[in-house]
Regions:
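Thiol-based oxidoreductase modules, predominantly thioredoxin-like and allied folds used
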Residues: 47, 96-115, 126-137
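Non-globular targeting/processing and membrane-anchoring segments
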Residues: 1-97, 101, 121-122, 136-226
Length: 226
């Protein structure tokens, strides 16, 4: 940028080197993940979709042998779902058409299907497959729920091996430490990280979301030439 002094240029060069190193380290971690050995064979868990049962094995479509499941946190009898989970899924919805070109992808939750579907409709999740767990077995198997029914956000990957489905990878967010954990799955924090103030104490909320989506739908898209 014109006008930058030497101190800025030197600091920016150090940052550039660190950014390159970070990208390389991310790939090292991704390679370690890809090289995980075969996980255990899992039961053919049952879910509910539009009132009908569907099995885990039936979620593998076409020739795609990999399935990614995001498990949305829900507290029994609560009117709303986890705002952070909903934030992640807002982003997934926008790129679902791209994700499903390569892997199978669904959203699951312990919530009753009608409540889950209504929540998805209120958020504009029109590109995602939503499933309700049929009982606690699946959530507890992936550590998305403990024995007392306390939920935890979870993303889990399965791989179909002939007629068997195997567990491949599971991860949970770490929201107590500046939202690190599965934040790589959302652009929100990365945009904050580009700013001088960083992430600060920001925390996702469901408040105001309906008004925002109504405004966005009502406003035309303006294209600006640069």
């Amino acid at each position: 940028m014109p006008g930058a002094d030497d101190a800025y240029r030197q600091s920016r060069e150090r940052l550039r080197a660190a950014e390159i190193d970070l990208r390389e380290r991310i790939e090292v971690v991704a390679a370690l993940r890809r090289s995980l050995p075969h996980g255990p064979v899992v039961p053919d868990f049952r879910f509910i979709e539009r009132g009908d049962p569907v099995r885990l094995s039936e979620l593998f479509e076409g020739n795609k042998a990999e399935l990614v499941v995001y498990h949305l946190m829900y507290w029994a009898d609560d009117d709303e779902f986890c705002p952070m989970c909903s934030l992640w899924i807002d982003g997934f919805n926008g790129v679902a058409a791209h994700i499903t070109q390569r892997v199978n992808f669904v959203i699951a939750s312990r919530a009753p299907y009608d409540k889950l579907h209504a929540w998805g409709a209120s958020r504009g999740w029109d590109r995602l497959r939503l499933l309700s767990d049929d009982g606690p077995a699946f959530a507890r198997a992936i550590d998305a729920e403990d024995g007392d029914g306390r939920p935890d956000a979870t993303i889990v990957v399965f791989k179909k091996d002939d007629d068997e489905v195997r567990h491949f990878y599971t991860a949970h967010p770490i929201l107590e430490d500046r939202e690190r954990g599965i934040d790589l799955l959302s652009p929100v924090w990365h945009l904050f990280d580009l700013t001088p103030s960083g992430r600060g104490d920001w925390y996702g909320t469901n408040e105001g979301f309906d008004a925002f989506t109504r405004t966005a739908k009502a406003s035309p898209i303006h294209h600006r030439a640069f």
